[in-house]
Amino acid sequence: MRIEIITTSNEALKETGFGTLKACNNVLDSIRRLGYSARLNVCETAGDLGDIVKRKPDLVILAVKYIAVEHGDDIWLSDYFKNNGINFSGSSREVLKFDSDKVLAKSHLRKNGIRTADYFTAIPGQYTCESELPIAFPLFLKPLDAANGNGIDDSSFVTNFADYESKLLWLYNLFSLPVLAEEYLDGREYTVAIINTLSSGLRVSAVEVVPPQSAHGLRILGEKVKKEDSEELKKAGDNELMNRVRKLAVDAFFHLGARDFGRIDVKVSTSGQ
């Protein structure tokens, strides 16, 4: 089997998937150790993708969702390789939209009976005082469509209207989109990896994610922490809470229509909800 890994320069992307060169090289080494022919491609243009199509690999592993094109439309890789008759890893573009749009994902999951934190979206000036806000403080503010902690830091946690307005304006100016405001959940945080295989079925692995404590006494899994890779990962045990965390992640995986693999982040309140 001939396998090719596809990634791109990450500077122009709001989200990177697992597309960093370090991660891609780790995947490349693992595939080669299994005895398969493998190649890593850092693609920048449609021409780069065309060269891959000409080689007709048996499988392409998509480490990013799209290639950003300056002064043009982004090239969504799942669509591109599907249209060219080449098998690809991961989910379709329709499913990947849930990964890019947090509100779309939340509303879809809620319609299917899966709990998410209460939320609303806002732009500067939409609400003029605390009493108008749909949810009471404390709130957590984040970009609508960015991943990898982009735009998230200690100031994302807001407890009063002045701080809310300040962070809202900053995010809106940076991303030019409405801002997502969520109820703040003050419990533990987990990430659940899911792999769905034909040979061995569903594999589910969860770890607890513990960000370092900041100078303000907060533990926020934001952009700085993720870039520095300074969070601690703790093995999740087998208990009633972890069984519920894993079940929630698996339910979300299937209701979102994901295939092959995914990673679901789960935050718990101090009451265990």
Q: Which ranges hold each PLM region?
A:
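Short loop/edge segments at beta-strand edges and connector loops
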Residues: V42-E44, T121-I123, E183, G262
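Phosphate-binding site of ATP-dependent enzymes
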Residues: F161-K247, V268-T270
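ATP-binding N-terminal substructure of ATP-dependent carboxylate-amine bond-forming enzymes
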Residues: M1-F88, E94, D99, G125-E130
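A short, local hydrophobic-aromatic micro-motif
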Residues: S89, A117-D118, V204-V207, L221, ...
